[in-house]
């Protein structure tokens, strides 16, 4: 097991041995899903899973996170990219709605449980992942084994990151044009798969077929 933090220790990277005994890099989504699974299992075992518990993730994070939250009777909330939005949502939900923030994550390797920190915490995440791996080892399982079990329960979720850079004022104009085009002519299919729902976080709308309703707010 290899655990690594970035210089300010707010993110966590992980490599584990796979079935072929080769090192396998885990994505931020995979790390977060494993930590979330461990947190939920521990809270349930201790009978401490809050009735109004909330799991918060960003819009670019795997939908598996929300599925796991709802599968354990918790609310799932998605916010814009950036951990500050996770923290703001957690504070608002606890203050205004009487909810309890349980766990937050973003696919860019940022994770947090509870209110001990105002930002993502790579040190806590490292400790949580190490404890999770040790518990799995006692049951003769690896993090990869547990990840596959989660996939069997909630469905396989795969993701890959592609970066495109648009520099300067021309780049900004290009980005704005892309967004306008998407809104004016939303795709009906992507890679041969039908688009069933479009969420517009600027206009705060959700489009399902011919129906348009208010978005997540």
Where are these regions (language model features)?
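Phosphate-binding and adjacent anionic-ligand microenvironments
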Residues: 1, 21-24, 42-43, 47-217
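N-terminal small/polar loop signature for handling phosphorylated ligands or for N-terminal nucleophile
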Residues: 1-13
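Short Gly/Thr/Asp-enriched flexible loops that form oxyanion-binding sites at enzyme active sites
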Residues: 10-30
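Catalytic or ion-translocation cores adjacent to nucleophile or general acid/base/metal-coordination motifs
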Residues: 27-40
